[in-house]
């Protein structure tokens, strides 16, 4: 496990939860995750769940993605998706507003790996360098990804070679995130 990435993710999650506590006097609330089982759920309302991060309990790797392509995935991606269970978190990096994707449960982790495989299949078909997404943006065709060749974090337009460098590594990126509520 990449300790710098794990700590940066835990630190951002703490900043996010602290900001939520300060503004709402509660743990983060999600309507999107209502009805989806998770160890993160601390209480449920009529149409939403309150959640708090929990330690990841599964196998701490994305080996299914590696096996599907017979490639080695950046260690930071293994760490990013297997440090904790948590709800997705809204954040800002510079002037970019994003939703940082998280693993909600072991079932969700399997789905995330399937989506990463699908993403890599498309990139391979289009002969694009491999990236692995970590966040979504308001613009549906743009994501924040980690380049599997260099480990750098970029803003990417799906299906194209258009990429903008954001950070040299995932820990640096996570350390610069500001929570958005």
Curated annotation (Swiss-Prot):
<dbReference type="Pfam" id="PF07348">
    <property type="entry name" value="Syd"/>
</dbReference>
<comment type="similarity">
    <text>Belongs to the Syd family.</text>
</comment>
<protein>
    <recommendedName>
        <fullName>Protein Syd</fullName>
    </recommendedName>
</protein>
<keyword id="KW-0997">Cell inner membrane</keyword>
<dbReference type="InterPro" id="IPR009948">
    <property type="entry name" value="Syd"/>
</dbReference>
<dbReference type="InterPro" id="IPR038228">
    <property type="entry name" value="Syd_sf"/>
</dbReference>
<comment type="function">
    <text>Interacts with the SecY protein in vivo. May bind preferentially to an uncomplexed state of SecY, thus functioning either as a chelating agent for excess SecY in the cell or as a regulatory factor that negatively controls the translocase function.</text>
</comment>
<keyword id="KW-1003">Cell membrane</keyword>
<dbReference type="GO" id="GO:0009898">
    <property type="term" value="C:cytoplasmic side of plasma membrane"/>
</dbReference>
<keyword id="KW-0472">Membrane</keyword>
